[in-house]
Protein backbone atom coordinates (compact mmCIF):
# COMPACT_ATOMS: atom_id res chain seq x y z
CA UNK A 1 0.00 0.00 0.00
CA UNK A 2 2.57 2.53 1.04
CA UNK A 3 6.28 2.43 1.54
CA UNK A 4 5.99 2.44 5.34
CA UNK A 5 3.32 -0.20 5.96
CA UNK A 6 3.62 -3.51 4.08
CA UNK A 7 0.65 -5.35 2.59
CA UNK A 8 0.96 -8.18 5.11
CA UNK A 9 0.02 -5.86 7.98
CA UNK A 10 -3.19 -4.83 6.25
CA UNK A 11 -4.03 -8.47 5.55
CA UNK A 12 -3.35 -9.43 9.18
CA UNK A 13 -5.60 -6.60 10.38
CA UNK A 14 -8.28 -7.71 7.96
CA UNK A 15 -8.00 -11.32 9.13
CA UNK A 16 -8.19 -10.21 12.77
CA UNK A 17 -11.32 -8.15 12.09
CA UNK A 18 -12.91 -11.02 10.19
CA UNK A 19 -12.14 -13.50 12.97
CA UNK A 20 -13.57 -11.10 15.57
CA UNK A 21 -16.73 -10.89 13.48
CA UNK A 22 -17.02 -14.66 13.15
CA UNK A 23 -16.46 -15.20 16.88
CA UNK A 24 -19.03 -12.54 17.74
CA UNK A 25 -21.49 -14.08 15.30
CA UNK A 26 -21.04 -17.53 16.84
CA UNK A 27 -21.09 -16.49 20.51
CA UNK A 28 -23.54 -13.61 20.85
CA UNK A 29 -27.29 -14.15 21.13
CA UNK A 30 -28.52 -10.58 20.55
CA UNK A 31 -29.81 -9.97 17.02
CA UNK A 32 -28.31 -6.47 16.79
CA UNK A 33 -24.89 -7.69 17.96
CA UNK A 34 -24.99 -10.49 15.39
CA UNK A 35 -25.93 -7.95 12.74
CA UNK A 36 -22.97 -5.73 13.72
CA UNK A 37 -20.61 -8.73 13.55
CA UNK A 38 -21.77 -9.45 10.00
CA UNK A 39 -21.04 -5.83 9.07
CA UNK A 40 -17.58 -6.16 10.69
CA UNK A 41 -16.87 -9.17 8.48
CA UNK A 42 -17.96 -7.22 5.38
CA UNK A 43 -15.64 -4.36 6.32
CA UNK A 44 -12.75 -6.79 6.81
CA UNK A 45 -13.28 -8.08 3.28
CA UNK A 46 -13.45 -4.49 2.02
CA UNK A 47 -10.11 -3.75 3.69
CA UNK A 48 -8.59 -6.74 1.90
CA UNK A 49 -9.93 -5.56 -1.46
CA UNK A 50 -8.57 -2.05 -0.94
CA UNK A 51 -5.18 -3.34 0.22
CA UNK A 52 -4.74 -5.58 -2.81
CA UNK A 53 -6.07 -2.95 -5.21
CA UNK A 54 -3.65 -0.36 -3.89
CA UNK A 55 -0.75 -2.80 -3.94
CA UNK A 56 -1.49 -3.80 -7.54
CA UNK A 57 -2.25 -0.20 -8.56
CA UNK A 58 -5.69 -1.23 -9.81
CA UNK A 59 -8.89 0.74 -9.61
CA UNK A 60 -11.17 -2.30 -9.87
CA UNK A 61 -10.75 -3.22 -6.20
CA UNK A 62 -11.81 0.24 -5.09
CA UNK A 63 -14.85 0.13 -7.38
CA UNK A 64 -15.80 -3.30 -6.07
CA UNK A 65 -15.57 -1.99 -2.48
CA UNK A 66 -17.91 0.83 -3.44
CA UNK A 67 -20.49 -1.67 -4.71
CA UNK A 68 -20.08 -3.85 -1.61
CA UNK A 69 -20.71 -0.79 0.58
CA UNK A 70 -23.86 0.07 -1.38
CA UNK A 71 -25.16 -3.49 -0.98
CA UNK A 72 -24.23 -3.41 2.73
CA UNK A 73 -26.20 -0.18 3.19
CA UNK A 74 -29.26 -1.76 1.56
CA UNK A 75 -28.76 -4.88 3.67
CA UNK A 76 -28.58 -2.74 6.81
CA UNK A 77 -31.84 -1.00 6.00
CA UNK A 78 -33.68 -4.26 5.28
CA UNK A 79 -32.07 -6.05 8.23
CA UNK A 80 -32.95 -3.33 10.72
CA UNK A 81 -36.51 -3.30 9.40
CA UNK A 82 -36.78 -7.04 9.99
CA UNK A 83 -35.25 -6.67 13.46
CA UNK A 84 -37.79 -3.98 14.36
CA UNK A 85 -40.65 -6.18 13.11
CA UNK A 86 -39.38 -9.16 15.12
CA UNK A 87 -39.00 -7.02 18.24
CA UNK A 88 -42.53 -5.65 17.90
CA UNK A 89 -44.03 -9.11 17.57
CA UNK A 90 -41.85 -11.05 20.05
CA UNK A 91 -40.71 -8.23 22.40
CA UNK A 92 -37.19 -9.67 22.61
CA UNK A 93 -33.96 -9.50 20.62
CA UNK A 94 -32.55 -12.76 21.97
CA UNK A 95 -32.09 -15.26 19.15
CA UNK A 96 -32.83 -18.23 21.41
CA UNK A 97 -36.23 -16.84 22.41
CA UNK A 98 -37.32 -15.78 18.93
CA UNK A 99 -39.09 -18.62 17.17
CA UNK A 100 -40.96 -17.36 14.14
CA UNK A 101 -42.63 -20.73 13.53
CA UNK A 102 -44.73 -20.37 16.69
CA UNK A 103 -47.47 -17.79 17.09
Swiss-Prot record:
Membrane topology category: Multi-pass membrane protein
Spans traversing the lipid bilayer: 7-27, 31-51, 63-83
Keywords, in A-Z order: Cell inner membrane, Cell membrane, Membrane, NAD, Quinone, Translocase, Transmembrane, Transmembrane helix, Transport, Ubiquinone
Enzyme class: translocase
Domain of life: Bacteria
InterPro entries: NADH_UbQ_OxRdtase_chain4L/K (IPR001133), NUOK/Mnh_C1-like (IPR039428)
Any one GO molecular function term: NADH:ubiquinone reductase (non-electrogenic) activity
Gene Ontology cellular-component annotations: NADH dehydrogenase complex; plasma membrane
Entry's EC annotation: 7.1.1.-
GO biological processes: ATP synthesis coupled electron transport
Subunit structure: NDH-1 is composed of 14 different subunits. Subunits NuoA, H, J, K, L, M, N constitute the membrane sector of the complex.
Function of the protein: NDH-1 shuttles electrons from NADH, via FMN and iron-sulfur (Fe-S) centers, to quinones in the respiratory chain. The immediate electron acceptor for the enzyme in this species is believed to be ubiquinone. Couples the redox reaction to proton translocation (for every two electrons transferred, four hydrogen ions are translocated across the cytoplasmic membrane), and thus conserves the redox energy in a proton gradient.
Family recorded in the similarity comment: Belongs to the complex I subunit 4L family.
Protein name (Swiss-Prot/TrEMBL): NADH-quinone oxidoreductase subunit K 2
Native source organism of the sequence: Koribacter versatilis (strain Ellin345)
Amino acid sequence: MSSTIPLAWYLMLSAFLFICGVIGFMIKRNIITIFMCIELMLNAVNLTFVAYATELRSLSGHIFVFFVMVVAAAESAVGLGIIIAVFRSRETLNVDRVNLLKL
